[in-house]
């Protein structure tokens, strides 16, 4: 497997900013879910795949994740760790604005933020409307809840990454 990773890294070159491929990962996990049988929890199987994918991806190119989290709220941190694995560097930021700024300013390649709520005073997703702005690349959790502490909530991962359709995608529309 390492030989394949080296070949892919060389083919992408040093200019590859973000090596993750969420559409490929989603398609693969959906295929695994369709043929999954037996008592072994699919969420555990998906977590093992997330760990392997993240570790091999880190060998291709370094990337890091900014997460909205503080000393009292760990849910998004746990969701991000379940998705991106234990080897990907993650940093907690206390506010949505600080977390999203990390991707806008290219300090981190991915930000994990709470799913939009109509009641939000300062909706972060409005900032994603520009042509060069980061975009939502995935919803978390993808394959069930792992080791989440605290109140469960959905989250979105945001990055500067063009996605290819998988055929099972959801579209987010911003109307002001």
Model region roles, listed by residue range:
Residues 1-176:
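Domain-level signature for soluble enzymes in the chorismate/prephenate branch of the shikimate pathway
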């Amino acid at each position: 497997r390492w030989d394949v990773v080296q070949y892919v890294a060389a083919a992408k070159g040093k200019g590859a900013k973000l090596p993750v491929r969420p559409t490929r990962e989603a398609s693969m996990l959906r295929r695994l879910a369709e043929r999954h049988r037996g008592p072994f929890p699919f969420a555990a199987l998906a977590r093992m795949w997330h760990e392997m994918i993240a570790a091999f991806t880190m060998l291709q190119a370094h990337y890091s994740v900014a997460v909205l989290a503080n000393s009292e709220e760990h849910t998004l941190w746990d969701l991000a760790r379940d998705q991106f694995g234990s080897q990907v560097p993650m940093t907690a930021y206390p506010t949505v604005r600080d977390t999203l700024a990390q991707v806008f300013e290219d300090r981190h390649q991915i930000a994990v933020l709470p799913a939009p709520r109509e009641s939000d005073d300062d909706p972060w997703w409005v900032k994603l409307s520009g042509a060069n702005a980061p975009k939502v690349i995935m919803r978390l959790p993808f394959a069930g809840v792992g080791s989440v502490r605290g109140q469960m909530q959905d989250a979105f991962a945001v990055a500067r990454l063009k996605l290819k359709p998988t055929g099972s995608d959801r579209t987010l529309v911003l109307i002001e």
